[in-house]
UniProtKB/Swiss-Prot annotation:
Disulfide bonds: none
GO cellular component: host cell nucleus
Top-level taxon of the source organism: Viruses
Compartments (UniProt record): Host nucleus
Protein's organism: Equine herpesvirus 2 (strain 86/87) (EHV-2)
Lineage: Viruses, Duplodnaviria, Heunggongvirae, Peploviricota, Herviviricetes
Protein name, per record: Tripartite terminase subunit 3
Primary gene name: TRM3
Keywords, in A-Z order: DNA-binding, Host nucleus, Hydrolase, Viral genome packaging, Viral release from host cell
Length: 686
């Protein structure tokens, strides 16, 4: 870091060190290479602008910067066809007299006439000249110059800058063009053109990202997605020969609007004689003198076969989240074409999973998904819980000048539709899963270990370490509607001298029919579970059972009575005291302890103190479905909701199922690890 007090002095010294006109007069001389080293070929390199130097210089940022500042490529001025051109900013370089004398002294003792070294140098020079003489080099340079000048208060008189995501769209388009038009010189041209974009420190591996066959952009509303696509396509057609571009929109009027905008742009800035238009099929053909024509085809997703049989090098899919799903196969088919790239661009509508499918690409092996929003993942929870927050607090937010975001806009839009501010205006691409992700309390590594590391409860070692008491929780449901809640049961055994527990049994039981025998059916299911566990685990001597009585206290007592009669093991029940009579009934009223039980369960999972048994018992879950996987599905759905009184509530109900089995396992684990509850014999009174 340069101290601010010394900055002016250093700038003055730098200014004095630069000889007047020195940089303008300096140029590369190809016929006098500098032979700096006599090392073996493996330890040296031929630099086209210097000579033979040690290979370690390939990592020298100073050398790279100096060579690029005097590269003849950047001295060539290609005039733009339209608008006002932009100069490529090049960092000036200078060699002081002292440095020049030191360099000559280092090279003075080395023979400059080494034939082998001269051959290596000549080869490097020829390679450099070939890349500059590449037939598509000037064509691609013209495209960049024209696009830069078009965006310099020509396309929009109020602006000469673009947003970062718009620049990235240009990069994906331009660098893919390099890879298909000059594949052999692609890496060299990558290095040359990255100076145009200011990507001085970007390595070659990062640049390979732009050669991907597909990329996805999720960008908030009104941020200039279609605007920049129109500019790119217009300059592609008029600057690059033999390029075939496709544009697909989700609605016909959008495709027609883009089609008309591109036509007007070309007619305004380029000769009309070069343009050939077929409005009936949305095609534009542009032909420059002595060049092959380039074409554009605009289509909609409603005619899913409209782009079949076409050849596109670049296919832009606008508002891709809203494309009809039966049109996707014809679009994705272009990924099989070697020289084709699909660019999906869409706003975010995460209120509906069907119009948020592009966000699923966040798990792709390649870095395909680019999301623009105003909230980072670390602060999404703060954003959701605090009503006054409208942007991420962790960094200085960049908001385009044409975008207004404040608390009043948030309140107004959310009055129209709850969550509209987050999903539509803020561009929160993860909002479809925000409720799940924000409240996600169990880590994926913990679930993987819970699933894979199962305890062999049948081994003598495990049996010696397990307590002989089985804890069973029954959450009864008196309905035969399989779409609604069923009876959940969870059985847990604790380990001796440890906080560890093992889940040994789960049930999710639905009544076959609504009769007066529902209590008998539920009790029979619980008795069958205890019998199976007693058979597999002979060390279990008794069962401590808690039967939830929130739905029906009479039925809960009936279940306890029937289970007491049918259980193969001695059974003790958790009792609830009647405040009026003082009588204790064999049932449990679930209340505020549920949150504490969930917290204990979540902590046990994340700390790996809760496991499942290899021989886990379930008589009701399908044989084709692993009971542990069935339980993990419900664990993943656990959500923590803050309440107005400062407390929290836990729930795992989701659209695809209920949380009955999970609640039973959570409560069984809670009773197995807590010393606050006393289990007593059936119907024992105070």
């Amino acid at each position: 870091m340069i101290l601010s007090g010394k900055k002016r002095m250093l700038l003055d010294n730098y200014k004095n060190a630069r000889a007047p006109g020195g940089d303008d007069e300096r140029d590369w001389v190809f016929d006098r290479p500098a032979i700096v080293t006599r090392r073996d070929k493996s330890d040296r390199m031929a630099h086209p602008y210097i000579g033979i130097i040690p290979r370690t210089n390939i990592y020298s940022a100073v050398l790279d910067s100096y060579c690029k500042s005097l590269n003849p490529v950047y001295k060539e001025r290609i005039p733009p066809v339209l608008g006002t051109g932009r100069d490529v900013p090049v960092t000036p370089a200078n060699v002081t007299g002292e440095l020049a004398r030191a360099a000559r002294a280092l090279c003075g003792d080395l023979a400059s006439g080494d034939p082998e070294a001269l051959v290596e140098f000549a080869s490097a020079v020829q390679t450099q000249r070939t890349s500059r003489g590449c037939p598509v080099f000037r064509e691609l340079s013209e495209f960049l110059v024209n696009l830069a000048s078009f965006l310099n208060r020509c396309y929009s008189v109020k602006s000469d800058t673009i947003e970062p995501f718009q620049k990235q769209l240009i990069l994906h388009t331009f660098y893919f063009l390099i890879s298909i038009k000059a594949p052999h010189a692609a890496n060299t041209l990558f290095e040359v053109f990255k100076e145009y974009f200011g990507l001085f420190d970007m390595g070659r591996e990062a640049l390979q990202t732009f050669k991907q066959k597909s990329t996805v952009y999720l960008i908030p509303r009104r941020h200039g997605k279609t605007w920049i696509v129109v500019a790119i396509i217009s300059m592609l057609l008029t600057s690059v020969e033999n390029i075939h571009v496709g544009y697909v929109a989700h609605q016909k009027h959008v495709a027609n609007s883009v089609f008309a905008e591109i036509i007007n742009t070309i007619y305004r800035w380029f000769p009309a004689k070069n343009v050939y238009i077929k409005k009936e099929n949305g095609t534009i053909m542009y032909t420059n003198e002595n060049r092959r024509p380039s074409t554009l085809m605009c289509a909609t997703c409603f005619n899913k076969n409209s782009i079949r049989g076409q050849t596109f090098n670049l296919l832009y899919v606008d508002e891709a989240n809203f494309i009809k799903k039966d049109s996707l196969p014809s679009i994705l088919g272009f990924m099989l074409q070697k020289d084709a790239k699909i660019i999906f661009i869409s706003s975010v509508n995460s209120s509906d999973q069907t119009t948020s499918f592009l966000y699923n690409l966040k798990n792709a092996k390649e870095k395909m998904l680019n999301v623009v929003n105003y909230v980072c993942p670390q602060h999404r929870e703060d954003f959701s819980l605090q009503e006054s927050v409208v942007s991420c607090p962790c960094y200085r937010l960049h908001i385009p000048t044409y975008i207004a975001i404040d608390e009043n806009i948030k309140d107004t839009t959310n009055l129209f539709m709850e969550g509209a501010f987050t999903t539509e205006l803020m561009g929160d691409g993860a909002a479809a899963t925000t409720q799940t992700n924000m409240h996600k309390v169990v880590g994926e590594p913990a679930l993987v270990q819970f699933d894979l590391c199962r305890v062999d409860t049948g081994s003598p070692e495990a049996q010696r370490g397990l307590n002989p008491t089985l804890f069973l929780y029954v959450d009864p449901a008196y309905t035969n509607n399989t779409e609604a809640s069923g009876t959940g049961m969870g059985a847990v055994v604790s380990m001796k001298n440890s906080d560890r527990c093992v889940v040994v049994g789960v049930e999710h039981f639905f009544l076959k029919e609504l009769t007066g025998a529902s209590s008998l059916q539920i009790a029979s299911c619980a008795a069958a579970l205890i019998r199976s566990l007693a058979t597999l685990h002979p060390f279990v001597r008794e069962a401590h059972v808690a039967i939830e009585g929130n739905s029906s206290q009479d039925s809960a007592v009936a279940i306890a009575t029937l289970l007491h009669e049918r259980s193969p093991l001695p059974v003790k029940f958790l009792h609830h005291a009647d405040k009026a009579t003082g009588v204790q009934w064999p049932m449990y009223i679930l209340g505020a302890e549920k949150a504490r039980a969930f917290e204990t369960f979540i902590y046990a999972l994340n700390s790996n103190t809760l496991s499942c048994g290899q021989a886990i018992v379930s008589n009701t879950i399908k044989l084709s479905f692993d009971p542990v996987a069935y339980l993990i599905e419900q664990i993943r759905a656990i959500k923590c909701y803050p309440l107005k009184d400062g407390t929290v509530s836990y729930c795992a109900k989701h659209k695809g199922g209920s949380d009955d089995t999970l609640v039973a396992v959570v409560m069984a684990h809670y009773f197995a690890t807590s010393d606050r509850h006393v289990f007593k014999n059936h119907m024992k009174q105070i």
